[in-house]
């Protein structure tokens, strides 16, 4: 796993708690600090493989009776993890870089968009940190484009993008020494 003890700790802790990946702890920390996902939220998880963020998102929706939904999108076919997820979680296999906003919006509850968009998309890592960070940035920009539309709108009622007005957007990026 990682070279340091911290990575090994989170890997083992994820296994112990039933998370499919240690990345679940990143979203747990964000959720604990900022409460971005509430009961009834509609969540879009871009780059959802292997499913750790799907698990945390579903948990954060609270009891099943509170409603809400989670849609995961990834180029890989992702099975909904059996632990920490229920029928509110669905996944599709699609390439986010070519997926039209209209298709994503059509997959949202009542076709009105999502209240939370999460992006944990990661490029195929080459090991060249500057290149990997640049590719990660491109994926982050695609998430931003899907969320808000291809240009900044002055009127929030324009309906461009799949993020609802007042919604939350989380984008995880790789970094390099050059990009800091």
Task: List each language-model region with its residue ranges.
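A generic alpha-to-beta junction signature in SAM-dependent methyltransferases
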Residues: 37, 61-65, 111, 150-157, ...
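Glycine-centered, small-residue-biased loops immediately flanking beta-strands
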Residues: 41, 65-68, 167
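Class I SAM-dependent methyltransferase Rossmann-like catalytic core
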Residues: 1-42, 58
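Conserved beta-strand positions in the Rossmann-like core of class I SAM-dependent methyltransferases
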Residues: 44, 71
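Conserved Class I SAM-dependent methyltransferase catalytic core
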Residues: 129, 133-180
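Class I SAM-dependent methyltransferase "Motif I" SAM/SAH-binding loop
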Residues: 47-51, 174
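Conserved SAM-binding loop of SAM-dependent methyltransferases across substrates and taxa
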Residues: 50-65
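S-adenosyl-L-methionine
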Residues: 73-124
């Amino acid at each position: 796993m990682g070279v340091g003890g911290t990575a090994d700790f989170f890997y083992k802790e994820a296994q112990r708690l039933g998370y499919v990946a240690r990345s679940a702890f990143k979203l747990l920390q964000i959720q604990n600090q900022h409460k971005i996902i509430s009961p009834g939220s509609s969540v879009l998880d871009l780059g959802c493989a292997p499913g750790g963020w799907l698990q945390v998102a579903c948990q954060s929706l609270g009891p099943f009776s509170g409603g809400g939904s989670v849609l995961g999108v990834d180029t890989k076919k992702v099975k909904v993890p059996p632990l920490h997820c229920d029928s509110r979680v669905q996944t599709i296999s699609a390439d986010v870089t070519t997926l039209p906003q209209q298709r994503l919006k059509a997959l949202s509850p009542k076709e009105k968009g999502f209240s939370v968009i999460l992006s944990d998309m990661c490029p195929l890592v080459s090991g060249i940190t500057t290149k990997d960070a640049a590719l990660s940035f491109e994926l982050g920009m695609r998430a931003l484009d899907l969320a808000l539309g291809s240009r900044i709108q002055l009127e929030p009622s324009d309906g461009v993008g799949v993020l609802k007005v007042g919604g939350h957007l989380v984008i995880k990026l790789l970094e390099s020494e050059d990009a800091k």
